[in-house]
Amino acid sequence: MIASESTTHVEQYQDIFKRLAGAINEHLELKQDLDESKVRGIVDEAVAAARLPRPVEVHMPDGTVNTLSERTHRQFEQVLSLIGEGHSNIMLVGPAGTGKTTLVKHAAKALGRSFAFISLSAGVTETHIFGRMLPQSDGTWAYVESPFIRIYRNGGVFLFDEVDAADGNVMVSINAALANGVLCNPVNGEVIERHADCVIVAAANTYGRGGDMVYVGRNALDGATLDRFVLSKINVGYDTDLEADMATAVGSKGQALVDWVNRLRDRIADNRLRRIASTRLVEQGVKALSAGRTLEDVKSRFFQDWSADEKSKVGEEA
């Protein structure tokens, strides 16, 4: 399968320059003064108009073309490539807020398949994954299928989110379903064959080797579990292009926000701080700026629970 944008990056930049030239010529013809603020306004309008989401066309092996109108993560094609290679188990590893869940959801939509997910917190048990037996009005008990079993049986894309936070016994129960192509449901004893179009994705903040400096409470995953994802792991980073697109909604203020977030990430990494500056910071920052708040307001909110030493290390006043 092949994913392609209906408009190339070259065409996109040509569109930006064309819009800029047209707007500036219009001002010159009207003999209007072009001060710095007007030039900034023209640039902001041109860039915002040219960076609207471009439809993505996914060409399926049977010749059909699925079109995705939403803006996709820059690693979207990597996920589709692994599926195209025949990988039915995929692992996405990356910091919080990089868009892993949305990335998988978009992949399912592009493939024309159903999508479901579960976050594997410590309280999740086998019944959440494999279904449960519930009492009926006539006094009997009936099995109620879970979203995972439905997709395993009928095809689709299922996401196990936060797998490095899961109970170890739960992951062992999932192992057979990941590798053997068949599952003996521990709830009702039914043997279910895995559908050929069933893709199972595991998302984590670590590589399953235990907690690290930031994600302290993460569990180590069993070696048998990790082996299910050999050659099908993707390190998912922040999509700075997507963040820049978000920021165009507030013009030059948005660019200042993005520049600050990028510098902040570098300083967090350089000083090995247990802090996160995710895409959500950009998203919520754009909302605040759109509502009339300033970048200083955004910073004040973000740093309210930081220590003076932490602020100093990232270049902010205590």
Task: Annotate each language-model stretch with its function.
Residues 1-318:
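C-terminal regulatory/interaction module of P-loop NTP-utilizing enzymes
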